[in-house]
Amino acid sequence: MRATEGEPTIPVDSAAPVPTKRSVCEEILASGYVQSFVDFFYLTHRQDPKATAGIVAGAASSKDNNDIVVSAEEMKFMKENLTRAEESRRKGDTDNVYNSYSNLAVYFQRGQVNDPKTGVYFYEKCLEIAKLTSDGPGEMSANHSLGCVHQQMGNSAAAIRFHERHMELARASGSYREMEGAARELVKVSC
């Protein structure tokens, strides 16, 4: 299983001018990273998942009040990982593509952002890359992560499906460590 060392850190550069969503979008697009632009635009021009939960509870009523707020550091982190993934894909460096998407998935799933649905989006990209390249350890890790995030969201059926796939891959590879990890998660989600 690929290990992610905690939550990725976001470096702070206090001397740089504060970018806007628009300026970063333009910079990404002008640099020729079309897919990165699309993903960045979506990530920075959507409703705040926390505010959306507030709508259900009746706490917010205005669309403008629900727009996600993204700091300069977060924009830099997203831009760097998205463009690195796209550039690496062009070069055929699938390990770096996987790692960049994994960084984004972990970032959105954990910490203050706490947006597991966006984490799922990037873990699914990891799974896609792993399948395309026959990366068994990467596929096991992505299935494990998708199972865990679906568990976190309360979607037991999906969690079980991903953990069972993780178990199948672990058995096929003969990795007892992976089988143990998949079994542990299956027990957690089943109880």
How should each PLM-predicted stretch be described?
Residues 1-191:
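Intrinsically disordered, low-complexity regions
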